[in-house]
């Protein structure tokens, strides 16, 4: 999102060690931000397996997003119930679709909702697109960044539970920095070409090694760069924020 992104020396070493350990994952965006937005809403507070099932059931039951928008909410609930919190997520999805419809009508657009959202994001910078998504009902900073990164290959860095925890332990950010604040910090220090691989590798590391409880420090490739075990001094490595 920023014009100039300068990683700290500590982050450079962390990035290189993560790549050595987990490789350099490549993004394969589908350029369907509306599908990605709905999918991200469905993924909240559930497993990938359950959210994928809910998404497939939703698009099988309702062929278009206009159909989802116009359907009785209880029918949406029925379609996505396998993903959990269906009563909440159904309303959020329809609220987003109705808001996009209102914007579309105000502009006199006749494209599909999927095309409308794609065009709205395409004509904006990454930062502007992130702010635009944040203004949609129920869309937080992580959801907005996920859509931009995964679906459009934009350099927006989502901060999920794993990324937040691992980043604090490594000393990339301060221990009191919230996930919302971390979005802005990573925006300043992560080069665009690093965004996707760093995000994916931090999640991988959080799932495999740096668990919330009983992290496997004796198996950690980042042991030499970790504030949690005292290998680095947080005051010298964290970015102010």
Located regions from the model:
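Catalytic cores of DNA base-excision repair glycosylases
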Residues: 3-240
């Amino acid at each position: 999102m920023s014009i100039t992104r300068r990683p700290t020396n500590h982050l450079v070493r962390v990035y290189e060690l993560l790549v050595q350990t987990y490789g350099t994952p490549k993004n394969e965006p589908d350029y369907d931000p509306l599908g990605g937005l709905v999918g991200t809403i469905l993924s909240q507070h559930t497993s990938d397996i359950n959210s994928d099932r809910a998404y497939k059931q939703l698009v099988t039951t309702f062929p278009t997003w206009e159909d989802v928008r116009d359907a009785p909410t209880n029918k949406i609930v029925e379609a996505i119930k396998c993903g959990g919190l269906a009563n909440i997520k159904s309303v959020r999805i329809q609220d987003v679709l109705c808001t996009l419809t209102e914007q579309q009508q105000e502009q006199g657009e006749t494209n599909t909702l999927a095309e409308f959202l794609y065009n709205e994001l395409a004509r904006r910078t990454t930062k502007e697109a992130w702010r635009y998504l944040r203004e949609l009902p129920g869309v937080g900073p992580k959801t907005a960044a996920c859509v931009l990164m995964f679906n459009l290959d934009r350099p927006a860095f989502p901060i999920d539970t794993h990324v937040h925890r691992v980043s604090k332990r490594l000393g990339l950010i301060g221990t009191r920095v919230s996930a919302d604040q971390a979005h802005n910090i990573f925006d300043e220090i992560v080069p665009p070409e690093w965004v996707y691989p760093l995000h994916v590798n931090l999640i991988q590391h959080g799932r495999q090694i740096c668990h919330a409880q009983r992290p496997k420090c004796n198996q950690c490739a980042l042991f030499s760069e970790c504030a949690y075990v005292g290998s680095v001094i947080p005051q010298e490595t964290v970015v102010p924020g």
